[in-house]
């Protein structure tokens, strides 16, 4: 960040921007001046799509180590001096969750919430064989769950074996599971169709 009344920084692989900053938009971290988490999230609204903007907001709100709060983000949106991205910010705010653990979970959750399917509960706590577990996205009424399988779930042998065991335990407890990977983030309609089939098979009769 540069002092006021100076030109935007120019350097290789760096794009400088000039912006109007409100009091509280600038914070210091380790001796470096930065825009605050809330102001940065607002600025990202001009370049990210809705799903990724929600994912960024979810990361700020993550309940185990929150960087911000919904109230502070709402205040930042209200004070934001530019119209760029404002519509997207306002669409994103009611979709934010403090319980989405990762970007893929957030993206799939946004797809589910903005479709005609019921809203899932992120990181829903269940007990499988007496052990506390969490299902990434869950419909407890219908016992339908969605789980993200990142690449580390494949390359880490212990993780892979644990995933299979937990998946089987969930089925034994009556859950119908939908698994998705990074590739599915580029084909979300398939995830929605699979989820809808599971829900209808468990008694969901559609929106309304």
Question: Model-found features: residue ranges?
Answer:
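Short hydrophobic/aromatic beta-strand micro-patches
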Residues: 2, 138-140
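Phosphate-handling catalytic interfaces
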Residues: 1-119
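Basic, glycine-rich
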Residues: 125-133, 140-208
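Structural detector for hydrophobic anchor residues on beta-strands
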Residues: 118-120, 135, 144
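A short acidic/basic microdomain associated with nuclease active sites
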Residues: 117-127
């Amino acid at each position: 960040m540069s002092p006021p009344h100076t030109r935007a920084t120019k350097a290789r692989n760096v794009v400088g921007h000039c912006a109007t900053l409100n009091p509280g938009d600038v914070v210091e971290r380790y001796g470096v001046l930065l825009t605050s988490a809330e102001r940065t999230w607002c600025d990202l609204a001009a370049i990210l799509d809705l799903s990724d903007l929600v994912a960024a907001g979810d990361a700020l709100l993550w309940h185990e180590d929150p960087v911000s709060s919904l109230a502070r983000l709402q205040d930042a949106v209200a004070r934001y001096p530019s119209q760029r991205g404002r519509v997207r910010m306002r669409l994103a705010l009611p979709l934010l969750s403090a319980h989405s653990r990762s970007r893929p979970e957030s993206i799939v959750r946004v797809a589910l919430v903005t479709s005609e399917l019921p809203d899932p509960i992120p990181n829903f706590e269940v007990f499988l064989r007496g052990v506390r577990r969490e299902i990434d996205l869950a419909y407890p009424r219908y016992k339908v769950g969605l789980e993200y399988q990142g690449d580390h779930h494949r390359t880490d042998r212990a993780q892979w074996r644990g995933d299979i065991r937990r998946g089987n335990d969930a089925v034994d407890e009556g859950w119908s599971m939908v698994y998705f990977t990074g590739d599915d983030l580029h084909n979300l309609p398939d995830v929605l169709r699979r989820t809808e089939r599971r829900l209808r098979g468990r008694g969901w009769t559609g929106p309304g």
